[in-house]
A protein has these predicted regions:
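M16/MPP (pitrilysin/insulinase) zinc-metallopeptidase core fold and M16-derived inactive scaffolds
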Residues: 85-157, 161-163
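M16/insulysin-pitrilysin zinc metalloprotease superfamily fold
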Residues: 155-182
Length: 182
């Protein structure tokens, strides 16, 4: 059983860029997406999919569903695969029971926590590509709603809601790809 501390995790990362902020949309709910469905593929059920996204003025709240075949925690081979694409993951600031960075827990942490950090890294990369300076932090939080059923919630702050949704979609695709390769 997970302790309260391992059920909840927070992350913050400062991007290297700060573009103009998109207008706030208020609360918007988007339907679930799974990368394979978007491509029109009839592939097996993805390991990770987003069931629901609510976009708020300052953050988006994402309900994430893991398939029954999906591990609930990360493992070294998965981390190695993700580090090839996201080498800065271990340096992310992260409140956790073992240290102050994501690197302290990344080899054995809830998979939704991994998804949170990959999405943040995608947002940081997007911000960095736009400009060269920023004082904006991206903050995330993840927690299980029902770990037995594989249902979790990831919350992410953003500067641009569309870029944040794109980052989440990319993160889901990359985590699914990495899980498939392990």
């Amino acid at each position: 059983m997970l302790s309260k501390r391992s059920e909840q995790a927070s992350a913050s990362v400062r991007p290297a860029a700060e573009p103009a902020m998109a207008p706030a949309l208020g609360v918007v709910s988007a339907p679930a997406f799974a990368p394979e469905a978007a491509l029109g593929s009839r592939a097996a059920e993805p390991f990770v999919r987003v069931r629901r996204v609510v976009v708020k003025a300052d953050r988006m709240v994402c309900d994430v569903q893991l398939s029954p075949a999906c591990p609930r925690t990360s493992f070294p081979a998965l981390v190695s695969a993700l580090l090839q694409m996201y080498p800065h993951l271990p340096a992310h600031a992260c409140k956790n029971e073992r240290g102050t960075t994501f690197g302290a827990v990344m080899k054995r942490t809830p998979l939704i926590h991994v998804l949170e950090h990959v999405a943040i890294d995608c947002m940081v990369q997007n911000e960095s590509a736009k400009t060269t300076s920023s004082d904006k932090l991206f903050v995330g939080n993840s927690r299980w709603l029902d770990p037995v059923q594989g249902l979790g919630r990831v919350e992410l702050s953003f500067r641009d809601d569309i870029a944040a949704l794109r980052a989440l979609k990319t993160a889901v695709e990359q985590v699914n790809r990495a899980l498939s390769s392990c």
